[in-house]
Amino acid sequence: MGLPEDVAKRAAWYRSELERHSYAYYVLDAPTIPDTEYDKLFRELQELEQQYPELLTADSPTHRVGGVPLKEFPPRQHGVPMLSLNNAFAPEEVEAFDKRIRDGLETIAAVDYAVEPKFDGLAISLTYENGVFTCGATRGDGVTGEEVTPNLRTLRCIPLRLRGEGWPALIEIRGEVLMFKADFAELNARQRERGDKEFANPRNAAAGSLRQLDSKITAGRPLSFFAYGVGAGADALAVKTHGEMMGLLAAWGFPVAEERRVVQGVRGLLGYFVEIGVKRPGLPYDIDGVVYKVNRLDWQAQLGFVSRAPRFAIAHKFPAEEALTEVLGIDVQVGRTGAITPVARLKPVFVGGVTVTNATLHNEDEVRRKDVRLGDTVIVRRAGDVIPEVVAIVPEKRPMRDLFGSEPLNPPFELPATCPECGSAVVKGDDEAIARCTGGLYCPAQRKQALWHFAARRAMDIEGLGDKLVDQLVDAGLVHSPADLYGLTVETLAGLERMGEKSAQNLVAAIDKSRQTTLARFIFGLGIRNVGEATARDLAKHFGGLDALLAADSAALQMVPDVGPVVAESLAAFFAEAHNREVIDGLRRAGVSWPEGEPAQAGPQLLAGKTLVLTGTLPTLKRDEAKALVEAAGGKVAGSVSKKTDYVVAGEEAGSKLEKAQELGVPVIDEAELMKLLAKGVE
């Protein structure tokens, strides 16, 4: 039975509409329909393609959600090599470049140059055949890259079919994949919320996101693309200048830099460099310089190439964003999780587009390694949105006690023994670089984080008490510790922003409901470092009551399964702090209670001694439910994959954990196979 003609027309219409709206949203930044309408069109096309698989085409927008994970990236040879550019760092080098160009062209007249920002991302090449995107690859060594086509299809700003007309049968589009600063900040915020490792900078985030074997992970990352040239197929274009070529790329549907233009002579080059340098801090993406290219394409061909770089182009790199200044003092700051960070107070200095008065020293070990002291002259670096840091001292400028320079005037930095915010003890593990305040529940610097964690669903489960409301309560001085939550009234809450009487009543009811909890939830809610849900359950089961736990010494704590010296030290330090004991007593006085002395009855331990890792979205089970089932059967659920992992349970959109399992040869099972293990055990 053939494909109904009306169905084929409908699918073509859906594809055309979706690409039109995507182009308006992601390239023109001018949305034409609400997201809900776009999603509706997308789902209808998906349903058609599922019903009629023969409808699926290479340019279908449904490819943008990602597909089956790859085992590796195949190599891909570029039709025309992707050469690197020579660099210039000083005006004299730019003047020398311009002279070489004029000498090569045998002209004394000023040359027209196409100029544009140098994106700080990952260079890629996109191949289009008859206007349809068929292949994409990274730069690699310039001759051969890695094919990452499925991942590039997920970038909504890359056209799957070229717009307009005038493109040859085969053409390679060159450009850069990057991540906007705002998107990078949001991605790292999500990484923090999930407890995953944060990315160091937008470039690393873009590169890591593009080189995922599972394209569904790439689809979930906020990547962007800018086109800046053409490889194979350039000879077939009816354009005479690079500027005209960029206009053609924009007409075909590619994002191109708005800051590009054509300037004349070396004076125009240097003027553009200064202009972009001033604009740089306000640009939505990172750049590390500007690119100059001879504008006329016939002159580019005449000048040719030298070694592995074109003669007709050069990258003018920005200087390192560093400056010298004096250390006026070394303070310590307390983070939301109790981390103690030394910070250098500096004589104000202009660097990286802003006036810097403070710079991080990271931790005590770093201060000692760099030997930063009061009065030192130091090198301060700032790049983009990165927090300014002290790179090194200038030894010859250090203040000395005498003219002979035999002894420094100021002593080495010493970390304070107590927290400057609350006076609680500061501790640092033997194998840890970061020192921490032990006043978790009491410390003002940690107050918001402690309250948010205490109210979380897996802890005391106070529905409606989110981070924004916690901010209001703390900022208004209404709540200083978790115990204060139980004194809040409807009248007090109703006066807060976006909190009506009904919402206030619901929150007071949720707080009241949380008074009856379990010991495991209470322990987890205290936010003790290194004590997660599983450890909290083990502690509750082992000790049966809070008083027994409070009285336990390090040796007794290490009798609990999976509690070693590090966890025991965290528990002992937390409970030894008088302020934390006061908060616990306050919670008990507020009526927070739980059944004591009734450890849970263990069921059949069919997974005893087995370690499982959960990744992705399971068909019917929530992750919490799957974890509880595994632990009830005696198994352990770990957060990362290692050689000691027995099984990885993978659902939809499984990420890097699935890749790690495949790499290590760890068995991968689905939800159905997990249920069999829970019912019958390991055969």
From Swiss-Prot:
Report the source organism.
Answer: Dechloromonas aromatica (strain RCB)
Pfam families tied to this protein? BRCT (PF00533), DNA_ligase_aden (PF01653), DNA_ligase_OB (PF03120), DNA_ligase_ZBD (PF03119), HHH_2 (PF12826), HHH_5 (PF14520), Nlig-Ia (PF22745)
Domain BRCT, residue spans:
602-683
Family matches, as PROSITE patterns: BRCT (PS50172), DNA_LIGASE_N1 (PS01055), DNA_LIGASE_N2 (PS01056)
Binding positions (Zn(2+)):
C419, C422, C437, C443
GO terms classed as biological process:
DNA repair; DNA replication
Task: Print the organism lineage.
Answer: Bacteria, Pseudomonadati, Pseudomonadota, Betaproteobacteria, Rhodocyclales
Q: Which SUPFAM superfamilies match?
A: BRCT domain (SSF52113), DNA ligase/mRNA capping enzyme, catalytic domain (SSF56091), Nucleic acid-binding proteins (SSF50249), RuvA domain 2-like (SSF47781)
Enumerate the UniProt keywords alphabetically.
DNA damage, DNA repair, DNA replication, Ligase, Magnesium, Manganese, Metal-binding, NAD, Zinc
Its gene is ligA
One GO MF annotation is: metal ion binding
Q: Protein name, please?
A: DNA ligase
Q: What does this protein do?
A: DNA ligase that catalyzes the formation of phosphodiester linkages between 5'-phosphoryl and 3'-hydroxyl groups in double-stranded DNA using NAD as a coenzyme and as the energy source for the reaction. It is essential for DNA replication and repair of damaged DNA.
Give the family, as the similarity comment puts it: Belongs to the NAD-dependent DNA ligase family. LigA subfamily.
EC assignment: the record states 6.5.1.2
Q: Which CDD domains does this chain map to?
A: BRCT_DNA_ligase_like, LIGANc
Catalysed reactions, as listed in the record: NAD(+) + (deoxyribonucleotide)n-3'-hydroxyl + 5'-phospho-(deoxyribonucleotide)m = (deoxyribonucleotide)n+m + AMP + beta-nicotinamide D-nucleotide
User: Which of this chain's residues are annotated to bind NAD(+)?
Assistant: D35, T36, E37, Y38, D39, S84, L85, E116, R139, E176, K293, K317
Q: What class of enzyme is it?
A: ligase
Cross-referenced Gene3D superfamilies, in alphabetical order? 5' to 3' exonuclease, C-terminal subdomain (1.10.150.20), 6.20.10.30, BRCT domain (3.40.50.10190), DNA ligase/mRNA capping enzyme (3.30.470.30), Helix hairpin bin (1.10.287.610), Nucleic acid-binding proteins (2.40.50.140)
